[in-house]
Amino acid sequence: MEMSFRWYGEDDPVTLENIGQIPTMKGIVTAIYDVPVGEVWSRERIQQLKEKVEAAGLKISVIESVPVHEDIKLGRPTRDLLIDNYIQTVKNLAAEGIDTICYNFMPVFDWTRTDLAYQYPDGSTALIFDETVSKKMDPVNGELSLPGWDASYSKEEMKAIMDAYAEIDEEKLWENLTYFIKRIIPEAEAVGVKMAIHPDDPPYSIFGLPRIITGLEAIERFVKLYDSKSNGITLCVGSYASDPQNDVLEISRRAFELDRVNFVHARNIKLGDGKSFKESAHPSEYGSIDMYEVIKLCHEFGFEGAIRPDHGRMIWGETGRPGYGLYDRALGATYLSGLYEAVIKGSK
């Protein structure tokens, strides 16, 4: 198991030097953030990124992510050219020795929260999702804004894309995902790249949009789309646990049994009323996930891939990208490493 850390490039207030000082830290999870979605990442740009990371004494463990263009998700005629570009990016990453790619198939919006700075009694702040608040939000008219909404969409463009998805139900989205997988995975497999689809976050429909990578049944359906280790998942326990109907340990065990876990996101959340939840500190006592059992499963199944502490609280007066500060994620990384050491030594 390789401890890794998300880094958002030169614009990230958390530096590679900061990250390299975290005990047990080996890898960086990053991407090229200024190439428009759908265009090819050149080998030159990948080399530049790799050299920068390695100069700090680290390595690129995972690319998170190579975004999937909306036209692919919608099944538009332009998808074939866009998939060709995606395949070329996968090949270019493989040529530079990068073998794991995280991606998602969420329509329009990435991870969704209703507050980026919910304040706990101790003064720390965290990301939360309030189901009641989310139902009042209108992505088209913008009466309420949502953290993570893509500012690159004008109101007219947002309306157009939301209207387009009105014609896409869950089965149609599965059909479009299947088309993508059947084109991508053979090419990824041929160059030794493991793809790792991230679950929908949260793992249920919002704003009437279909969401399909949501739980155990979805994972079992997904892995059958193409029988290859290259067609794997990102086991994001915090995302799966955000649906109170999901048993995240059952999901984790089954995913490992299927040998499709290519990347692990380890963060904790505290379930609230209905489908509301708050992100918490990583230790089990603060959330609804038994992190010790998650790490035990990683060891039991011999997981050797990258794991990273996911979103953290903002603590000790830190400011920066919500969920992606240094301090709480560093605490999370050392906590996870401590659990891993305890599991290994306790199993002897």
Curated annotation (Swiss-Prot):
It catalyses: D-mannonate = 2-dehydro-3-deoxy-D-gluconate + H2O. Keywords: Iron, Lyase, Manganese. SUPFAM superfamilies: Xylose isomerase-like (SSF51658). It is an enzyme of class 4 (lyase). One of its GO terms (molecular function) is manganese ion binding. InterPro entries: Man_deHydtase, Xyl_isomerase-like_sf. Its cofactor is Fe(2+); Mn(2+). It holds the Pfam family UxuA. It comes from the Bacteria. Pathway: Carbohydrate metabolism; pentose and glucuronate interconversion. Its EC number is 4.2.1.8. GO terms for biological process: D-glucuronate catabolic process. Gene3D superfamilies: Divalent-metal-dependent TIM barrel enzymes. HAMAP family: UxuA (MF_00106). NCBIfam families: PRK03906.1, uxuA. Belongs to the mannonate dehydratase family. Catalyzes the dehydration of D-mannonate. This is Mannonate dehydratase. It comes from Streptococcus agalactiae serotype III (strain NEM316).
